[in-house]
Amino acid sequence: MIRVHVVVRVLLTVTALFVTSVSVLAQDVGGDVGGGAGIFRPKNPEAKRTARTTPTTTSGRTSPRTTRPPANTAVNERFEEMLNKGNEARDARRFSEAEEAYQGAANLKPRDSRAAYGLGNIYADQQKWENAEAAYRSAVEFAPKDVDALVALSVVLTQPRGGADTARRYVEAESFARKAVQIDPKHAIAWDRLGVALQARGLLNSETEHSYKRAIDLDPQFAVAYAHLARALNRMGRAAEAVPLYAKASELAKDPPTLNLIAESLQAEQLWKDSEPVLNRSLQLDARNPTSLMLMGRYLVVFKRYQEAEPYLKQATEVSPRAYQPLNILGRAYLGMERLADAESAYDRAAQFASETEKKQLAGMFGFEGLGDGYMKAKQKESAARAYQRALDLDPGNRTLGDKLTKARSR
């Protein structure tokens, strides 16, 4: 496997599954204002089309060209082929195939940053933030002036995962974005990500505003930056200035990733109903976009429209079967419908891909603990004990779970 700075664990970003009422503030799907799968999509690593050595014909005889290829030509050509294969599979959302191809490229040339960057991309596409961070860190180590890798690493570091290192990650996200704009001062996305990183740190100040405005100045068609600036101004108490910026972002948005970002920002501002038409537009463009499906499912769960949420969330899990969050939200929908066996199945699947922080959240009231409570209410004590035990396995230090387990096992 490719060498990375941190142990690559499975999966995704954290949402404690958020709601019993609309008034509860939900975590952003892809980050505070950032974007992960379907919201920020870094471009594919560049794969060179290497020309193979071909014979030439002289005086009726076939002989090789006089230029002798380097000894590692075959390795280089195979590496480029694997990159191309990974890129094509990624574009088709065949993530397992893409991962295998990029990993194969990394095995051939372990210090070529493009393989690590490609792996980071497909992990980010699936919201496997910890995996993506590890891969992008390797890419930056191998190519410290690669602006695309710096920006991508900044993106994944702003994804909310919980844990004690959140503040450190946000500081690093700012550092990598700042380095990117120093290397390329005309990189609009890098300026936008600098604003995101500053805002993630709680720094809603003139520099944050300037970063977003600089991104817009460099690319007036950059819908994402308008949405980010609008959200920052909302947080700064300047809601009247934010309204036309959201409108401009919606006007400029032409693709699902941008529409997802706008919808995500609206949901984070508790403007849930405003996010619905934006998500409908996104799904009209790409009915299988996993982020659009998940955001729509989340919107419906917030309003307790569980039956309507189910098909969106099920399809999201089909498109990204190893993603934690859609499974977690699907389990919440089943719990809301009192389909306890289905909820248990969804939570069991989610647990396979949860990080350590996510495991504790999955153990809670919107996970196995809530499932156990549901079984107790239905007088299914044996099933309740199983759910509480599962919760305790995920969060061993939780005394409340221990007490509930004891009660469920009592005759």
Segments (PLM) and residue ranges:
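Structural marker of alpha-solenoid helical repeat scaffolds
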Residues: 108, 142, 183, 218, ...
